Amino acid sequence: MWLTILGVALAAPAGLALYFVATARRIARPTRGEPIVRDATKAALLVIDMQEDFTRSQGANAYDGQERDRAIGRINALVAAARKAGEPVAFIRQEHQGRAVQWIASLLLGGAGNPGRPGARLDRDIDADGCPVFVKHVADAFSDPALDAWLREQTVGRLTLTGLDLAHCVRGTALGARNRGYRVTVDLAGSLAAREKPALHAVDEMETAGVVLRGPEDGAPRAAMV
């Protein structure tokens, strides 16, 4: 009896660690879908996960306040430019789905990203008036079929992505978009990254997939921005 209990106790941490790893991989995996049509040429802007749970976090993964304000200023400028050009703009929100994932978020992130929290809303300084908001439960925003359908209805074939986190949901959405044939640009000046090494790895991965990384001034790829 005691040996059985001891065995379970010893195995539990290893099993829990494996579950964490498997869950993280599932959440990070880019989705695949039907290729877009050839005549889809319109441009659109997607702003990812700029929610107060993340932008104004005070925990270990908190973003620098000045960097956050810089990114928000850039995003608002991109939104204004897209509106002036008559291009669609959409915002993406993260909501963790499932008790296990929400428990992990509570354990590791203080509950950030769990539904029903005041911090689940878009940042107070973001200009999202009149823009549709799509909710995702994993890194790739294309996991919500409504987003892809909305883009296809408007014959969008070119996407500019920005937001957070560059190493996770921006990366996942960029790769999910490329899997469907969208031409993708990531605006680094409007993007935030909590950790440098994962962000640099994501930059390499996105460039390999054909994503254009635009810096703040000359439009050239700028890994140094992260």
Range-by-range predicted roles:
Residues 170-180:
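Short Gly/Thr/Asp-enriched flexible loops that form oxyanion-binding sites at enzyme active sites
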Residues 111-133, 194-226:
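Structural recognition of alpha->loop->beta junctions
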Residues 115-163:
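Internal catalytic-core helix/loop-beta-alpha segment
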Residues 160-164, 182-196:
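A short glycine-rich beta-strand->turn/loop micro-motif centered on a GG-aromatic cluster
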Residues 86-87, 155, 181:
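Glycine-centered short loops/turns at secondary-structure junctions
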Residues 58, 101-104, 145-146, 171-173, ...:
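Short, well-ordered secondary-structure micro-motifs
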